[in-house]
Amino acid sequence: MVTEIRIHYEGDTELREGFRSFLREIETANEGHPPRLIAGRGREQAIADFRKALRIHPTAVNVLLIDSEGPDDGRLFETICQPQQIAEALKDRVFWMVECMESWFLADVDALCQHYRKDLREELRAIPKSRRFPRRTY
């Protein structure tokens, strides 16, 4: 029986609010119980926390959300997770933040500046143009 959903993610605790909003449907589907969001400051910590949770919380649905650091070549699990001793059987519990996802956050600079702070615009200009993506509506 599943007692809880635990999402271990690569990133700062400041991301929790955004993830909570993004994952609101999971809370609804899980009878009002939000998934537990566990921040790992880096990839290694997120993976270590995930592996530990598999042992300590065996009745929970433990999920790992980490950055792909590049395009998905179809071998991300093999090259990133297997060397960290994450079993192939857990492949369906690992999810990737890909470059495209990161570009969504930078697509509307005006909205980011309005929500966060005015001087953010200067910091965003420091991002190389090759990393910027045109704004599109899908």
Task: For every predicted segment, state its role.
Residues G11, S68, V109:
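Residues immediately flanking
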